[in-house]
């Protein structure tokens, strides 16, 4: 069967932003205007179509990125709605990995907020072309031009205004389209509100002409012929100008800026036009690269139905009716139900039984899909996030995704012994869905420990266990996920000998330990020359060292950023084995404790507090008392923004303190920034607690 839409008519894009910038409302309006939603859902009354989990509807925030397909002007739009809360950055990361373009929503009053910077950096990493929708232009304090300046200053981006607002706050009427040089004015604020094109009013004509000139000057830089014609006094046509803006947006040269108010139904249709006009189709972004499963050489998969089939699983979700759903992006080829694909990461075959097109939480069965599609596949057994599914005859592993380590953990146990097994199943299912959620069993206490990206993250997971899996659990107080590392270099020479009749065990290792680069994890190298330690025993040394990393040296926390170099050793023809060298390496690492001054590291959070001016002194004093380092403060509108670096250990319960100290008028956001050595007094306290 042929495809309904040419691949050139696809737009795979996401909507990303800081929490409360109006992403979900914008998506709701898009779904309404593209004819997919019969009634509009409001986030305020918990009925938004994209927010389909109970917790999302209660809390008014988006937790899981729901994928949906809709149509506009003969183009097929696959939209992924992403969460803006910092605890769910992993969802944003996963979405960006499989998208071709993005719309970044800003709150016209707040402008660029901390989470905006985070998602923008993530999009930079994946080289995603994006445009900006300055939303909430009707809000008190809305300032379009300040937002544009913040995009430049804070994001280091090149904003290109393709619209200007007509009025702001309660006076916001519509926009000036700088490409057509016309006003678009909405009549009323009702659903499906009509708008009309008008000539630009006299008092805005100069401003419009100034921004139009800047727009054209930037756009013609994308094409020499267009630039020459412009320099000779020839204005580009509307079509040429659109194609130049498209070219620059896709090349990441600049970001088109639009504005409106999704809640009041103004500016959404022109935003949809801009998605079609400026964001790339799957053939206009670089082809995805991968590694040939057999030869380990780099291979490229172009976005074409004629290429071998390859998909990337980017999200696992438990659906109450269908069971486990795997969301996947079809990068190349064509797929029908009933076919078996190879999961190259797990080296297992998966049969494609049922494929669905998702519209938020309703679904439509499909029999086949093509390059560029985003589909949900039901019933895959072994596939997890980041796995590649492909044609077994042309196996490939597509680029993996990187997932951050959790920074907060807590103990959890079922309220009744009967729920023990259900708890295990629930946690495994949740961990399969969310790679930033980890679980382990504490060997000493036997407790189950869960770890995640923040208090809200773990709150919601515990809540989901109760609702979806009917498991009631007791939860301990949140604990900081400390790490350990080494402060200095040290040389350890260790010999492992064991003789108990027959062949014994013998291995000698001489290892130089030292601190590694931040973020390097564990780096092992061998400088053995001349067979003092035979080649086949060296992997045993590495394995032994790695086994100590998880258990820690001083307080039982995982060891990070260590460089270990095997410089010498000795073996015995009969008594040496891989196991003997593994045991020797393990003991050598433990002995490094007395040579390399191990240290405890704690997660340091980047905190931003936005507070009314009169509370600034109190907010700064409170952050200082939490061992915080104030990084700076600035005015934003009539509020003060305080930036600080604060240890996570001192931030538990901060939200309630801030609320009572500022009568609920201040807000804060917190992001993990880096690990740092703990002060000695605190270190001793933590070690004593963990003993």
Curated annotation (Swiss-Prot):
Official protein name in the record: Elongation factor G
Pfam families tied to this protein: EF-G_D2, EFG_C, EFG_III, EFG_IV, GTP_EFTU
Binding site for GTP: 17-24, 81-85, 135-138
Originating organism: Maricaulis maris (strain MCS10)
A single BP term in Gene Ontology: ribosome disassembly
SMART domains, A to Z: EFG_C, EFG_IV
SUPFAM superfamilies: EF-G C-terminal domain-like, P-loop containing nucleoside triphosphate hydrolases, Ribosomal protein S5 domain 2-like, Translation proteins
PANTHER family, A to Z: RIBOSOME-RELEASING FACTOR 2, MITOCHONDRIAL, TRANSLATION ELONGATION FACTOR G-RELATED
